[in-house]
Each structure stands twice: as structure tokens, then as C-alpha cells.
């Protein structure tokens, strides 16, 4: 009986908000290296041109970025936005590209108590399901797409 209750509880937690990895099981891990300078990562993780629209889709997608579970912002298409974290309106005016990249790659480096997931860092994490260990939530291009989108959000609420 206890085993069934644990199984049901774990299934419910997984359904409520599991972060899907950026690449499927069995695919090679092609994470780019990066250098932290101060409170940012100045160089892009990829040489590809960022796709702002894809960045918006990731931010508002409850199955991929999950940003709107905690953040709100100027995205009317995203219903039931969160209020646990900062409103993303004005993000592009508040933080530089390097600072935004750092917050996505490894927010805990700036604030060890944060509840924001590390979307790109994979080492030293806790409570990661075995099937996702060693896999980033977003790949390098997706991180750059989100950074590019957030940089467009210049107006404050």
C-alpha cells in the first residue's frame, strides 16, 4: 500500500512539472564551455544567430522553459502566470546579455538559495531524476534564444 502511494505521489509530481532535457536519451552531450566573468557569461554559448521568437516560445511554454510558473510578463498568450519571481517586463533594461545568460545557465551561482533551476549547468545538482542526470534543460542555442528574447523586454511594468 505504501509503495502504491509513493508511486502515485511521484507520478503526480512528475506530471506537474518535470523539466524535459534538451536532448533525447542516447544523443551526444554537446554542451559548450563557458567562462564566468563577474556576474555574467559574456560570450554566447553558440555561434548561431539567436531566434527571438523561439526564445519567446520557450519562455511561455509550460512543458519546456516553465518560466511562467514563477514569472509573469508581457505575454498575453501565457495564461496563469506566476508571482513567485520577478516580472520579466523590463528584463532587457535591468540586466545585460551576459547577466541574463548567467541567470539561465546557473542562477544558483549568483544566489545559492534560489529556486530557479539551472537550465544549462548539469554538475552538482540535487533531486534530478536518473533519466535527466547530466543533461541540460535547455541546449546552448535555446539558452541564446531565450537571452535574445529577454533582451527585447525593455519596458517596465
Regions found by a protein language model. Give the residues of each.
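Electrostatic cytochrome c docking/interface patches
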Residues: 28-62, 157
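Sec-exported extracytoplasmic/periplasmic mature domains
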Residues: 60, 93, 105-109, 148-155
Amino acid at each position: 500500500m505504501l509503495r502504491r502511494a509513493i508511486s502515485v505521489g511521484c507520478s503526480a509530481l512528475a506530471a506537474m512539472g518535470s523539466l524535459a532535457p534538451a536532448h533525447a536519451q542516447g544523443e551526444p552531450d554537446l554542451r559548450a564551455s563557458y567562462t564566468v566573468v563577474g556576474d555574467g557569461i559574456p560570450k554566447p554559448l553558440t555561434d548561431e544567430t539567436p531566434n527571438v521568437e523561439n526564445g519567446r516560445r520557450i519562455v511561455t511554454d509550460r512543458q519546456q522553459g516553465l518560466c511562467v510558473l514563477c514569472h509573469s510578463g508581457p505575454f498575453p498568450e501565457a495564461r496563469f502566470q506566476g508571482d513567485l519571481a520577478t516580472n520579466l517586463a523590463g528584463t532587457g533594461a535591468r540586466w545585460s546579455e551576459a547577466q541574463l545568460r548567467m541567470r539561465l545557465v546557473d542562477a544558483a551561482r549568483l544566489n545559492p538559495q534560489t529556486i530557479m533551476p539551472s537550465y544549462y549547468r548539469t554538475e552538482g545538482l540535487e533531486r534530478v531524476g536518473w533519466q535527466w542526470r547530466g543533461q541540460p534543460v535547455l541546449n546552448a542555442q535555446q539558452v541564446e534564444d531565450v537571452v535574445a528574447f529577454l533582451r527585447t523586454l525593455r519596458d517596465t511594468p
